[in-house]
């Protein structure tokens, strides 16, 4: 973003009555390696040159690295390769996997082939493309195994869908001091129905 704002800017295309420029959705401005000093300098110079207020939309930056999505293996089968069907869905619960593409990290998993057992992880919907990706594990997956996807908070309430009536994931917090998990919201049929009306 800093590079974009420091280039010549075709502001003459904007309405003269506008005094606000909104930028940065999707920029990871909270990452430790993000050049915040440069961004501040560029925004300060931009404001002075164009006499515009600049609003930095934090987007997913406020939740970067936060939250997990805990899933269970529903079925394991083989069709040219080992497959594991999960009780989650790329299309319903993590659409950036299909749109970006975005590859979420799974605890104790690695890229395909890096560990002894590689699986293509699929979602639970009927969509042929509901595929999360290929991951490898130290041991074979079994029905009921839990897989924990990291950095998933930015999906929890914003981009999820109830495609084909798939239930949204429950929202819970974990207290590391006590190990207690508190469920704050469980979604059900009423939530699906109310999205349609």
Describe each region flagged by the PLM.
Residues 1-77, 164:
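Active-site loop/helix belt of alpha/beta enzymes
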Residues 42, 53-197:
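Charged (often Lys/Glu-rich) extended helix/loop segments that serve as interaction or gating elements
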